């Protein structure tokens, strides 16, 4: 190992290791325990080992080579207790308890968005891996019961806000060609199924324009006819969204039933004229607040008009309205979805597109994008009350509910399930029992929208 080592000033030392600096250190060359020094060195006769230079010949042997120790085996994967909420496989400790990714995300969204859920049973639903999406009220209560911390979510959110603010300065809000193409596709889908206010020839009616009544039958007949047409146009809009038709038919119907009223309310509120306090439908019919109440909106009227006023400062164009509608529709937290993960994957690029588009359009208003997203929560709240309004409306109208409006509300989240309140009809619709969740009903099926006799543009 060492062929010709000059030993300078050797002095005895108890140190068991060889000095690595043979030529410059004053410390002696120390002989190791395992006989590294050859016989020539062992025969060195001067027992004092002082001062003079000597040449010590050493020889290496295979037994003297340093063999590296084998690498330590990796530690075994950490095993967590099953999710405290649904007993699914846990991905770690989240917000204070062992939880799966699904329950972690559900709890975070619920707290961050201040979601208000309703249980339409007895507030004692069993929450497990299979049933966790059926009642969001009971699922949230279970999260809190097992110890999930709201404060942890808020702290996490504040940390993310700070990180996002730092990152925002570095981000370059440039639309990629694919994103531009998608925005144009959504804009076109919105414009083809919802003409803007400036394209309409307005007309009015004198029916019950001065005072509120329980229901004006003539206004209701006209309103329900227009609502049916608007539902069909909403289905056509959905069919043109990127990836929507790649979902199962059952999921397409589930999403349409859950979000249709959200989209209808958003659309009609973009046709609000604040100076006259009126709203205009797709055939040009323009109703004031009193007439909207009498046409069937009832106690929902003031909520809808307040929401319309809140939209005014946002000054949304067709692309933004279309993107926000698409985000409402493609929402993976709707109950009874077969492929909720795939729905979330379709929503993600829409969120990114809206973020970049809004920032480019308003470079000096960085908070406009989150303000728009918050409107989805408002829409869901109004939709939930709209679904409740339908129940009373069915008892007020002289005849039966139009079939498409009633079908749209069958098994909707706002009426039957305990889901996030996002279902409803076009200002009127029927509750009642219907087809099983996910069943393919012919008139709501996206594949039959074009064949409907009412599918012409309103």
UniProtKB/Swiss-Prot annotation:
Q: What induces it?
A: Induced by retinoic acid.
Q: What are the disulphide bonds in this sequence?
A: none
A GO molecular function annotation here is: zinc ion binding
User: GO CC annotation: what is one?
Assistant: nucleus
Gly residues composition-biased segments: 415-435
Name the predominant localization.
nucleus
Q: Does the keyword Protein biosynthesis apply?
A: no
Q: Point to the regions of Polar residues compositional bias.
A: 49-64
Where are the annotated segments for Hinge?
156-177
Q: Which SUPFAM superfamilies match?
A: Glucocorticoid receptor-like (DNA-binding domain) (SSF57716), Nuclear receptor ligand-binding domain (SSF48508)
Residue interval(s) of motif 9aaTAD: 403-411
> Which intervals of the chain are annotated as region Modulating?
1-79
Name all NR LBD domain ranges: 178-412
One GO biological process from the UniProt record?
Answer: negative regulation of transcription by RNA polymerase II
Q: Provide this UniProt record's keywords sorted from A to Z.
A: DNA-binding, Metal-binding, Nucleus, Receptor, Transcription, Transcription regulation, Zinc, Zinc-finger
Q: Where are the zinc fingers (NR C4-type)?
A: 83-103, 119-138
Q: How does this protein assemble? A: Heterodimer; with an rxr molecule. Binds DNA preferentially as a rar/rxr heterodimer.
Q: What is this protein called?
A: Retinoic acid receptor alpha-B
Organism, scientific name: Danio rerio (Zebrafish)
Give the gene symbol: rarab
